[in-house]
A protein has these predicted regions:
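Membrane-embedded helical hairpins/re-entrant loop segments and their flanking transmembrane helices
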Residues: 102-159
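Small-residue-rich segments of transmembrane alpha-helices in multi-pass membrane proteins
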Residues: 30, 34-39, 73-82, 106, ...
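Small-residue-enriched transmembrane helix starts and helix-helix packing motifs
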Residues: 1-16, 117-131
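Membrane helix-loop-helix hairpins that form the core translocation module of multi-pass transporters
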Residues: 39-110
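Small-residue-rich hydrophobic segments that form or flank transmembrane alpha-helices
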Residues: 3, 7-71, 140-178
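General structural feature for long, well-ordered alpha-helical segments within catalytic domains
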Residues: 4, 28, 94-100, 120-123, ...
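Hydrophobic alpha-helical transmembrane segments in multi-pass integral membrane proteins
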Residues: 85-88, 92-96, 134-141, 172-176
Length: 178
């Protein structure tokens, strides 16, 4: 029964992300600890969000701004390597603390959000978004401010954001596989 409920929640949060363009992953990772063990939280979240974002990127492929992907990808590879090494030293019992702190700061701290906006490079955005996703799971807001600044068209922002999040989640899933 938990699997059915989690599937419905995943569908609903993915729908929110599809309509609004962001937020579904953060909602999902806040709910998931009620249904799955902590050691599976980040990898399962990565798999669900990988499929959600990848399908959104495929459906909106004509709006994806491919010129940002190489810089983001390079930063992502470096970030995932460094943060994967750090992950070996973090106890799983702290993962909910990191996730909760990140969500609260993202939603309620103007100062935190201002600091995030300083990373005005797709390389740095890839580094931090993909690296931090190993620990907190839902890091989509890190690139959305940059995309919103560079592209005023909502379809371009949503499709490109989905492509970048697909990269993040694919790399995260590969790291957790090994």
């Amino acid at each position: 029964m938990n699997e059915l409920i989690l599937g419905i929640i995943s569908f609903l949060t993915s729908t929110v992300a599809g309509v609004v363009g962001i937020g579904g992953g953060m909602m999902l990772i806040a709910i998931m600890p009620s249904f799955i063990p902590l050691n599976a939280l980040i990898p399962v979240h990565g798999l669900t969000q990988m499929s959600s974002n990848f399908s959104r990127a495929v459906f909106g492929y004509k709006d994806v701004q491919f010129e940002v992907i190489p810089k983001f990808l390079l930063g992502s590879f470096i970030g995932i390597g460094i943060f994967a090494a750090i992950l070996n030293f973090i106890s799983l019992q702290y993962v909910p603390l990191f996730i909760g702190t990140y969500i609260l700061l993202s939603l309620w701290s103007e100062k935190f959000n201002e600091k995030i906006k300083r990373y005005e490079s797709y390389f740095l955005a890839g580094f931090f978004q993909t690296g931090l996703s190993m620990v907190v799971g839902a890091t989509g807001p890190l690139t959305m401010t940059l995309l919103l600044k560079d592209y005023q068209n909502k379809d371009k922002v949503v499709a490109t954001g989905a492509a970048l999040m697909s990269i993040t989640h694919i790399l995260k899933v590969f790291v957790f596989m090994y």
